[in-house]
């Protein structure tokens, strides 16, 4: 009797572990029971349940003496519940996986009979490595809300976070109106669902709990404090200002590359929905006119095909644009195929209608081979031995060049005294020279001396004739000739 009760209670314990949350004392009691009653030759069956927790069915043998009074009462209570469920005819289905608790040589059998598997190859050395599932922190099967905490500290997308959080708070309050009739409970909910500066704002602000919607007051205050939008005092003016900014941005938007169509449409659509619905048709026409290449054709199609509510649909206009874009892509593919088309295949369709006409021919295409501009490896050059004078070439001697005398420099030669270092008007000998008198007369007439008009080396040659020296030289030459004749005689 004790064995059957123990088996059923243990089975119900591991089966209900994924559905009912046991207390810590009950859980510890069952674990201690299993550790004391198990022998070394016992086998544990692991079972998988619909929940995420692993459930284990243990087959144990024990005696009546090993069960205390407190433990038997607890086991009998669980056994009664298991008997009631077994009478109903509903039994859980387990996927049995047998494994040796002590890591022995027992190997599970294969269904196909091919041979032993390698499931139990890894042996457990110490009993401390035994696996026992822990108590689950949350009740399995319980649905949890997907709403998180609102934390907008140092966030860039604050408006999106506030809008999502406000939508979920409003959904909770509207679906549970009986629990949130008092503004205090709503503020308590909003305070516990925020953190950081948003929580400090809700906690430290005095809210008007008598008039108006408390959720709307909190959202307007967040818009004012964290986004800089004055929704608390003048909400209408802020919305009008947002509409004007959206209109200006839609006017400035440009699409230069058709490949960025998706990004352009997303930006344009986001700003268009900030305006009034009655102005949508005009903005859609403006959107189509901004698209290059296919914008005009898409605009004519939109005017003919749009009717009813589709006149206000930017998505319908974007659909037409994509259809026209796909047509152009197909046409470009056909043009690429036509370039590769062989004209010799035209005679297959019908007989030739040209007689005596010059046949069209095309030049053969020779593919230009690619030549590497660099080598894959660095060439190694042996360093040559230095030999002095082998490749020495003496420098050419260059003559002395005349110094160039630009205007304003005092390194030219004076034409009065023929000395470098000063001009003629500054010459110290100009008073005693005839050239100086000419210079003074020129200064009276308002004339200034200029540089020498001639460039290069200038030389003066003087040729003088002396008759007396020539006569003496001739006489000496005659005397010498007569003396030579006498000696010869």
Curated annotation (Swiss-Prot):
Organism: Cauliflower mosaic virus (strain Strasbourg)
Protein family: Belongs to the caulimoviridae capsid protein family.
SUPFAM superfamilies referenced in this protein's UniProt entry, alphabetically: Retrovirus zinc finger-like domains (SSF57756)
UniProt entry tagged with the keyword Zinc: yes
GO molecular function: nucleic acid binding; structural molecule activity; zinc ion binding
Lineage: Viruses, Riboviria, Pararnavirae, Artverviricota, Revtraviricetes
Protein name from the UniProt record: Capsid protein
Chain intervals with Polar residues compositional bias: 135-144
Zinc finger (CCHC-type): 412-429
Presence of keyword Zinc: yes
Principal place of residence: virion
Feature: compositional bias, Basic and acidic residues: 95-110
Description of how the protein assembles with itself and partners: Interacts (via nuclear localization signal) with host importin alpha.
């Amino acid at each position: 009797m004790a064995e059957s009760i123990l088996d059923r209670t243990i089975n119900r314990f591991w089966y209900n572990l994924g559905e009912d949350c046991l207390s810590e004392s009950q859980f510890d009691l069952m674990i201690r029971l299993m550790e004391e009653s198990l022998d070394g030759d016992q086998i544990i069956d692991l079972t998988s349940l619909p929940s995420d927790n692993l459930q284990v069915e243990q087959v144990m043998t024990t005696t009546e003496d090993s069960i205390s009074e407190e433990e038997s009462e607890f086991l009998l209570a669980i056994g009664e519940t298991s008997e009631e469920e077994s009478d109903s005819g509903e039994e859980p289905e387990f996927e049995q996986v047998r494994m040796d608790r002590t890591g022995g040589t027992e190997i599970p059998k294969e269904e196909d009979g091919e041979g032993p598997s390698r499931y139990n190859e890894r042996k457990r050395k110490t009993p401390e490595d035994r696996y026992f599932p822990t108590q689950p922190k949350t009740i399995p099967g319980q649905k949890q809300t997907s709403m998180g905490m609102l934390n907008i500290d140092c966030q860039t997308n604050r408006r999106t976070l506030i809008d999502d959080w406000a939508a979920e708070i409003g959904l909770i309050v509207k679906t549970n109106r009986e629990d949130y009739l008092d503004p205090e409970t709503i503020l308590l909910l909003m305070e516990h669902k925020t953190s950081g500066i948003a929580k400090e704002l809700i906690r430290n602000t005095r809210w008007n709990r008598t008039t108006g919607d408390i959720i709307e007051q909190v959202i307007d205050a967040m818009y004012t404090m964290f986004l800089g939008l004055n929704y608390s005092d003048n909400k209408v003016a802020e919305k009008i200002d947002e509409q004007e900014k959206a209109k200006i941005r839609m006017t400035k938007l440009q699409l230069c590359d058709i490949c960025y169509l998706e990004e352009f449409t997303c930006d344009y659509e986001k700003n268009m929905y900030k305006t009034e619905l009655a102005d949508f048709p005009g903005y859609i026409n403006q959107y189509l006119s901004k698209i290059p290449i296919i914008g005009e054709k898409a605009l004519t199609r939109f005017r003919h095909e749009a009717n009813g509510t589709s006149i206000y649909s930017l998505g319908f206009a974007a659909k037409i644009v994509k259809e026209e874009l796909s047509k152009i892509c197909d046409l470009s593919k056909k043009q690429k195929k036509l370039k590769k088309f062989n004209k010799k295949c035209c005679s297959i369709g019908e007989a030739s209608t040209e007689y005596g006409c010059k046949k069209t021919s095309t030049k053969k295409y020779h593919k230009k081979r690619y030549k590497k501009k660099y080598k894959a490896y660095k060439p190694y050059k042996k360093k040559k031995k230095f030999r002095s004078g082998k490749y020495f070439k003496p420098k050419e001697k260059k003559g002395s060049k005349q110094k160039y005398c630009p205007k304003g420099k005092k390194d030219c030669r004076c034409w009065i005294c023929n000395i470098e270092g000063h001009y003629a008007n500054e010459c110290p000998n100009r008073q005693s020279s005839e050239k100086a008198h000419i210079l003074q007369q020129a200064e009276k007439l308002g004339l200034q001396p200029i540089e020498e008009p001639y460039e290069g080396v200038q030389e003066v040659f003087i040729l003088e004739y002396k008759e007396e020296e020539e006569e003496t030289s001739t006489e000496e030459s005659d005397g010498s000739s007569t003396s030579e004749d006498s000696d010869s005689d």
